[in-house]
């Protein structure tokens, strides 16, 4: 049966490396061509929305509410046009971010009302949810240092430290109350993080991989 696996985390948490480890581990189990997605984005229209969220507009500031709505509009496109059809066709899906990012960044970081965030999720996704989320937990200071070392920061990456501290608090709140979320200490050295991801995924696949 097809599954939907999501990698989550703050900027600089190592999501791209985690995704590579997940794909390699799945391949060892004969799952060789999962559909990969990213949020925001993943469809032609959703990528346009991603550009607005990431870069803004030179002539007009993007309000927090507009940002929230763009993110959920992009998610609706991706889930409806890519993720659900892929799963229905029997394909596994590995996603770089999903709804938990909005709950953390917009709910925690931006401070949107919890009821509003729950309503947005319910309205756009219904009961659709990932089978497994691997949350890469990292101290925001370290994460931002890593992100800065990659080069020019986008609109979100330029947010102040307290934004990411609030986002991390919300991430951890969800992770500590949802058995489908596995937390990885992403502040460790690369080899240790890699081993942790593979070990956690192997355990999960042993009981959920069929």
Swiss-Prot record:
Keyword terms, alphabetized: ATP-binding, Kinase, Nucleotide biosynthesis, Nucleotide-binding, Transferase
Pfam families attached to this UniProt entry: Thymidylate_kin
Enzyme Commission number, as recorded: 2.7.4.9
Biological process terms in GO annotation: dTDP biosynthetic process; dTTP biosynthetic process; dUDP biosynthetic process
InterPro entries: P-loop_NTPase, Thymidylate_kin-like_dom, Thymidylate_kin_CS, Thymidylate_kinase
One GO CC annotation: cytosol
UniProt-annotated binding residues for ATP: 9-16
Presence of the UniProt keyword Nucleotide-binding in the record: yes
GO molecular function: ATP binding; dTMP kinase activity
Superkingdom of the organism of origin: Bacteria
Catalytic reaction equation(s): dTMP + ATP = dTDP + ADP
Presence of the UniProt keyword Nucleotide-binding in the record: yes
Enzyme class: transferase
Function: Phosphorylation of dTMP to form dTDP in both de novo and salvage pathways of dTTP synthesis.
Record-stated family: Belongs to the thymidylate kinase family.
NCBIfam families xref list: DTMP_kinase (TIGR00041)
Protein name: Thymidylate kinase
């Amino acid at each position: 049966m097809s599954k939907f696996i999501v990698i989550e985390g703050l900027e600089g948490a190592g999501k791209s490396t985690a995704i590579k480890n997940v794909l390699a581990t799945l391949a060892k189990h004969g799952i060789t061509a999962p559909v990969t997605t990213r949020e925001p984005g993943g469809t032609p229209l959703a990528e346009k929305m991603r550009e607005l969220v990431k870069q803004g507009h030179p002539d007009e500031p993007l309000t927090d509410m507009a940002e929230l709505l763009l993110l959920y509009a992009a998610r609706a496109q991706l889930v409806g046009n890519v993720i659900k059809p892929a799963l229905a066709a029997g394909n596994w899906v590995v996603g770089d971010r999903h709804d938990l990012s909005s709950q953390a960044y917009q709910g925690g970081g931006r401070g949107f009302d919890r009821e509003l965030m729950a309503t947005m999720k319910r309205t756009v996704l219904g009961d659709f949810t990932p089978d497994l989320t691997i949350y890469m937990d990292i101290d925001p200071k370290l994460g931002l240092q890593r992100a800065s070392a990659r080069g020019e920061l986008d609109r979100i990456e330029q947010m102040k430290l307290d934004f990411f501290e609030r986002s991390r608090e919300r991430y951890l709140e969800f992770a500590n109350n949802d058995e489908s979320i596995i937390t990885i200490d992403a502040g460790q050295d690369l080899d240790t993080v890699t081993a942790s991801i593979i070990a956690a995924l192997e355990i999960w696949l042993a009981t959920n991989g069929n």
